[in-house]
Amino acid sequence: LGSVLNGGGSWPNGKQSSVSDWVTLADDYFLASTDQTDGSSGIPLIWGTDAVHGHNNVIGATIFPHNIGLGATRDPDLIRRIGEITALEVAVTGIDWVFSPVAAVVRNDRWGRAYEGFSEDPQIVRSYMASMVRGLQGDKATDSLFSPSKVVATAKHFIGDGGTTDG
C-alpha cells in the first residue's frame, strides 16, 4: 500500500472528527506503513484528501467560497493566500496531499458541478490554478516549496470536464 485517498464524506471517527482525531489517524497510518516487523520495507505512505475550498472534512477548519465565487473576484493573489491557509490546515492534521485545485473550464452553466470551476475563461482558470498550486505547495523562488506547512497539490477534473452538453 503506497497511498490512501480520503474522499468526500470520509472521517476518522464519524462526521464530527476533531483535528486530534485526524492527527491520531495520520500517526496510525504512519506507524503501520513504516512497521518492518513482517519484513516489509517500511516506506511511509502518502495520504490525500479533497480540499477544494478548505479542509472541509475537519470540524473548525476554514471553509472558503466555492471556486465559482472565487473566480468572480479576479484576484489571483487571494487564491494563493487561500491555498496557503488550506495547506497549513491540512498539514497540521497529518495529511500531506490534496486533490485540489479543480481545473474544469465550465462551458455550460447547467452542469451540476459548475460551482467547482473558477471560470469559463481558460486564461482565468490557468492563472488561478497556478496561484492555488503555489499557495498549496509553496514557491521555489521563496524557498517555501514543500516546507512543513505545505502539501502536494493535484490538479483534477481537467480533460473535458466542464464541457458538457445539455448540462
Regions found by a protein language model. Give the residues of each.
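Glycoside hydrolase catalytic-domain context in secreted enzymes
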Residues: 1-167
